[in-house]
UniProtKB/Swiss-Prot annotation:
Composition bias, Low complexity: 246-266
ZnF segments: NR C4-type: 151-171, 187-206
One biological process term in Gene Ontology: regulation of DNA-templated transcription
InterPro entries: C.elegans_NHRs, HNF4-like_DBD, NHR-like_dom_sf, Nucl_hrmn_rcpt_lig-bd, Nuclear_hrmn_rcpt, Znf_hrmn_rcpt, Znf_NHR/GATA
Annotated GO CC locations: nucleus
Family: Belongs to the nuclear hormone receptor family.
Classification via Gene3D superfamilies: Erythroid Transcription Factor GATA-1, subunit A, Retinoid X Receptor
Protein name, per record: Nuclear hormone receptor family member nhr-34
Function field: Orphan nuclear receptor.
Domain NR LBD: 306-581
Subcellular localization: Nucleus
C-alpha cells in the first residue's frame, strides 16, 4: 500500500492565515511504526447559520476540497536530514517533511512529485510579522515562486518574497533605496494617498509607509548592505557598470561607456573616463533619480546596439536628463501655480532652471488627453528645464566660457526644444504634437474644434509644419535614438556671431566630431548600405535642421501674439526668449548677485520681470558663473 504522510491542515491554516471554519477536512492516512496504515478521521465543523449538510465520511483517497500549490523551499536543512520525507509522496506532506525536503533531492529525483502545500483557493499570504514564528518552516528562507500572488504594497501581479513580505521588484527596489539612503518623504495630502501599481510613484511617502505596514523589514535591507560591503570585489571589476543612485547630497554622473576595443577615430579621443558630475551639489539638492525596478543609469537597448562611444554617451546622457526629477512632484498631483512660473529673468532661469518648472517625470508618450491653454504654459516651462539640464550635463558645453555658455544656450534652447517635441511625437505615433505632460494637440480638424481658440492659434500651423517637414520624414527613414541624440547635439552646437573667437572654434571642432560619429553610427546600423545609401541617409538627417529652425521661428510669432493678449501665461520669460530682444546681449557686467528662490515682481505683460534679492540658501553660481544683464 502506498505510504502517506500526515498533513496537519489546521497547522497550515494557522501558518498561512487560512480560515477553515467551513472547509472540508480530509481523512489522513498515517504510516504506523509496525508498517500497517492507521486511519485518523477528523470531522467537519458544523456552522448552523450556513445550513451545511451533516458531516459524512469521504473515501480514503479522495482529493481534498482545497487547492494544491507548489511550495518552493530553499535549503532549509542539510541534505542528511532530507530523508525524513520518503520518495513516495503523492502531493501531501507533513510539516516536518516539507521543512526537511532539500532542493537537491527534488532536483535529482525525477520520480518524486514536487511537494505540495494545501491552502484554500482564496488565501492571500498574511504579514509574516503576525505569523506564529514557532512553526517549523522558517518563512524568511522561503523564496516564493507562486504564480498569481500580488504585491502587498501596490498590487503588482509579478511578486515574490522580499524583505519579509510579498512584494514586486519595483517596491523592493524602492524600499531598499529608501533605507540605504535614509530618505525622508512628506505627503502633501495627509498620508491618505492610494498606492496602486499604476500610480505607485506618485507619493513616495505613502508608498514607504505602506511598505512598513505590510511588514517589510528594514533590518533585512541593512544586513544585505553589510554583505555588499564585506564583498566589494564586484564593484572593483574592470568595466563594471553597476548603477549609482544619487542622493540629494551627492552629484550625479554619467557612467563611462568607453571600451578597450574601439575603432581608431577622432571620435574615440573623447575622454569618457573623466566626465564630470552632471550637476554640482547645490544644483542636485532636492533632486533624485526616478524610482524604477530597472536602474535608470543602465545602458539602453539603443545604446547597446551602437558601437560608437560618443553615441552611447549621448544616449546615456539623454536618459539621465529625463530621469532627473524633483521629489514628490507629478503633473497630476501638483497645482497649476506650483508647477511652473515665468516671472523670472533669463539669467535667473538659466542659473536655476528648477525655478521655472518642477522637474516632474516626462510623459511624452502618454497621449492621455487633449491639450488645454494651461498645458501650453506647463509644457513650455517643463520642456525649457529639460533643455537647460541637458546642456549643463554635456562636457562639450561645460568647456565653453561662462559667457559663451549663456550666449549659446539662450539662442539654441528653443530649437533643441522643438527637436525633442518632434522626435517624441514620432515615437508616440501621434498625429499632431505630443507634449511633455502627457497631453497632445491633434491635427484632426474635428478634434481641434473641441479646444480653446488660443490652443489652435498656437499649435495649428506648428503641427502642420512639424508633421509634414519633420515627423513624416523621420517615419520614412525610421530614425533611431542614436541619430536623434546626434542631431540634438548638432542643433545645440551651432555657431553664433556673438560667441567669442575661442567659442566659435570650439563649436566647429565639436560639430565635426558629431558628424563623424553620425557617419560611423549609420554605417554600423545599416551595414548592408552602400556608400551612396549611407551618404543619402546622413543627408536626409541633416536636412531636418533647417526645418527645425523654421519651426522655432514660427513659434516666436505665436508666443508674441499670445503674450500680447495675455493668453496661456506666456508673457515674461517665454516672451523674452522668443522676441527679437534675444539677439541683443550688451557688454558689461552686472554686479547683481541675484539668486532666485522667490521673485517678488509682478509681470503683467510681455516684458521681463525685475530681479530681486533673496536669501542665498539656494545658489548655483559656482556651476555657471555668467552675470550678463539685459537693459
Amino acid at each position: 500500500m502506498t505510504d502517506y504522510c500526515i498533513f496537519n491542515i489546521s497547522w497550515m491554516s494557522d501558518r498561512f492565515g487560512c480560515e477553515t471554519g467551513n472547509e472540508d477536512v480530509q481523512e489522513c492516512i498515517d504510516k504506523s511504526p509496525n508498517g500497517s496504515p492507521t486511519t485518523s478521521t477528523t470531522h467537519r465543523r458544523q456552522n448552523s447559520s450556513s445550513g451545511l449538510e451533516p458531516a459524512r465520511k469521504r473515501p480514503k483517497l479522495s482529493p481534498p476540497v482545497l487547492t494544491a500549490m507548489p511550495l518552493d523551499l530553499t535549503d532549509a536543512v542539510s541534505p542528511n536530514e532530507s530523508q525524513a520525507c520518503t520518495s513516495s509522496l503523492k502531493g501531501v506532506v507533513t510539516a516536518a517533511g516539507a521543512a526537511q525536503m532539500s532542493v537537491a533531492d527534488r532536483m535529482t529525483s525525477s520520480s518524486v512529485a514536487p511537494p505540495l502545500c494545501i491552502v484554500p483557493r482564496s488565501v492571500e499570504f498574511i504579514n509574516p510579522k503576525t505569523e506564529d514564528m514557532s512553526m517549523d518552516i522558517p518563512m524568511g528562507n522561503v523564496q516564493s515562486e507562486f504564480t498569481g500572488l500580488k504585491c502587498r504594497v501596490c498590487g503588482d501581479s509579478r511578486a515574490g518574497r522580499h524583505y519579509g513580505t510579498i512584494a514586486c521588484n519595483g517596491c523592493k527596489g524602492f524600499f531598499r533605496r529608501s533605507i540605504w539612503e535614509q530618505r525622508d518623504y512628506v505627503c502633501r495630502f495627509g498620508g491618505k494617498c492610494l498606492v496602486v501599481q499604476e500610480y505607485r510613484n506618485r507619493c513616495r511617502a505613502c508608498r514607504l509607509r505602506k511598505c512598513f505596514t505590510v511588514g517589510m523589514d528594514a533590518r533585512a535591507v541593512q544586513s544585505e548592505r553589510d554583505k555588499h560591503k564585506k564583498n566589494p570585489k564586484d564593484s572593483n571589476n574592470e568595466g563594471s557598470t553597476s548603477p549609482q543612485y544619487p542622493t540629494a547630497s551627492t552629484p550625479i554622473s554619467i557612467p563611462s561607456t568607453s571600451t578597450s576595443q574601439t575603432p581608431t577615430s577622432s571620435v574615440n579621443s573623447y575622454n569618457f573616463q573623466n566626465i564630470p558630475g552632471i550637476v554640482s551639489r547645490s544644483f542636485s539638492e532636492n533632486l533624485i533619480m526616478r524610482d524604477n525596478s530597472v536602474p535608470v543609469m543602465e545602458t539602453s537597448q539603443s545604446a547597446a546596439l551602437s558601437h560608437v562611444p560618443l553615441v552611447r554617451y549621448l544616449i546615456d546622457l539623454e536618459k539621465a536628463t529625463d530621469n532627473l526629477i524633483d521629489e514628490n512632484c507629478d503633473f497630476m498631483s501638483m497645482e497649476f501655480d506650483q508647477l511652473c512660473r515665468v516671472d523670472v529673468t533669463i539669467e535667473a532661469a538659466f542659473r536655476q532652471p528648477g525655478v521655472v518648472a518642477k522637474r516632474t517625470p516626462p510623459r511624452w508618450l502618454a497621449l492621455e488627453r487633449l491639450t488645454t491653454l494651461e498645458d501650453v504654459h506647463i509644457a513650455w516651462c517643463r520642456s525649457f528645464v529639460l533643455c537647460i539640464d541637458y546642456a549643463k550635463i554635456m562636457k562639450d558645453y561645460q568647456e565653453l566660457s561662462p559667457t559663451d555658455q549663456f550666449t549659446l544656450l539662450r539662442n539654441r534652447v528653443i530649437s533643441v526644444n522643438w527637436l525633442c517635441h518632434t522626435y517624441k511625437t514620432f515615437k508616440a505615433g501621434c498625429d499632431g504634437v505630443a507634449l511633455v505632460n502627457g497631453s497632445w494637440y491633434p491635427r484632426d480638424k474635428e478634434l481641434q474644434k473641441q479646444l480653446d481658440p488660443g490652443c489652435n492659434h498656437y499649435f495649428r500651423i506648428l503641427s502642420e509644419h512639424l508633421m509634414e517637414d519633420l515627423v513624416i520624414p523621420m517615419r520614412e527613414m525610421d530614425m533611431d535614438e542614436g541619430e536623434f541624440v546626434i542631431l540634438k547635439a548638432l542643433i545645440l552646437f551651432r555657431a553664433h556671431r556673438r560667441l567669442s573667437e575661442e567659442g566659435r572654434a570650439h563649436i566647429k571642432r565639436v560639430r565635426d566630431k558629431y558628424i563623424e560619429a553620425l557617419y560611423q553610427h549609420v554605417q554600423h546600423q545599416h551595414r548592408h548600405f552602400s556608400s551612396v545609401q549611407t551618404s543619402m541617409r546622413i543627408s536626409k538627417i541633416l536636412l531636418l535642421l533647417p526645418s527645425i529652425e523654421h519651426l522655432s521661428q514660427q513659434e516666436d510669432d505665436n508666443v508674441q501674439f499670445l503674450a500680447l493678449f495675455n493668453l496661456a501665461n506666456l508673457n515674461g520669460l517665454p516672451y523674452e526668449l522668443h522676441s527679437s530682444i534675444k539677439q541683443h546681449i550688451p557688454n558689461g557686467d552686472d554686479s547683481d548677485d541675484t539668486q532666485v528662490n522667490e521673485v517678488t515682481s509682478n509681470n503683467d505683460g510681455p516684458r521681463s520681470s525685475e530681479s530681486s534679492h533673496t536669501p542665498q540658501s539656494v545658489s548655483t553660481s559656482q556651476f555657471l558663473e555668467f552675470k550678463p544683464s539685459l537693459h
